[in-house]
Amino acid sequence: MTDAEIGLPSTTGFAPATLVDAHMHVGDFPLFNVHMDGPRLSQTLHHYGIAAGMVFHPDNQYVREVVEAVDGAYGLVWANPRIPGFLEEAVELLDHPKFLGVKMHPLLDAYHPNDPAVHPLIEELVRRDMPALIHCGHPIFTLPWSIEELAVAFPAAKVILGHMGHGNIIYINGSIDVALRNPNVYLETSGMPMHTKIAEAVDRVGPERVLFGSDAPFHEIGVEVRKVQVSGLTPDLVTRVLEKNSRRLFFGDENADRPISRG
């Protein structure tokens, strides 16, 4: 299937195998009129010059099938503490070489991010030196200050604020403030519409704790990349946000092209 046949723009201008996308969904989402199966993901990665994409879906076994089939695709375990056996499933999948952390969506799954039921999972992530990407930007469960409670309780955990507050300036500023107070908190850019806030985050929080994410297929990847490019950052810092920071966080080294062996 050609790029045109699956609805991708005809040109992008991005070098091949360069970007690292910290936030991608796979699956069918009829409510949003979008979908991303394995073949489409493979073509999307190639088309946009994405060297590696972190993908997830509430059905973790489906994600496993996708990442095993698609070069450049890596899984984040969807962790829902309301589901019996969620911890055991997470531990099993985190042993898989293509799973590099967890995704938490307290808004969708209706739990506080610092619920004690989550704590054993975070302890496991700390032991493995793996991050948690947490949806951030909506009441009642995903405000940045609620997620901060988890980051404070586990200062050795690597906590990524997905969407860095999303579309509300109060929550965006709050996310930057939370990251400023907590050196274990990272900011991820997808779905956050204010391009200048990306540069502000880099300036205030530091150049190594802001990550590019697209939220594909819900957001168009080229638009999300362009936000970073026009944010006011220098070219070196644009490169750091678009790829190097995620390589460091997920792969273990900012110059690595795949995860460093876990021993």
Label each region the model flagged.
Residues N114-F212, S261:
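Catalytic pocket-lining loop regions of alpha/beta-barrel enzymes
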Residues R40-T44, Y62-V66, E89-L93, A117-L121, ...:
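A general structural detector for well-ordered alpha-helical segments in enzyme core domains, enriched
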Residues G27-F29, N60-Y62, R82-G85, D109, ...:
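Active-site environment of divalent metal-dependent phosphoester hydrolases
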Residues M1-A22, L31-A52, P207-R209, G222-G263:
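Mid-to-C-terminal alpha-helical segments outside catalytic/metal-binding sites
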Residues H23-G27, H105, H135, H163:
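Histidine-centered divalent metal-coordination motifs
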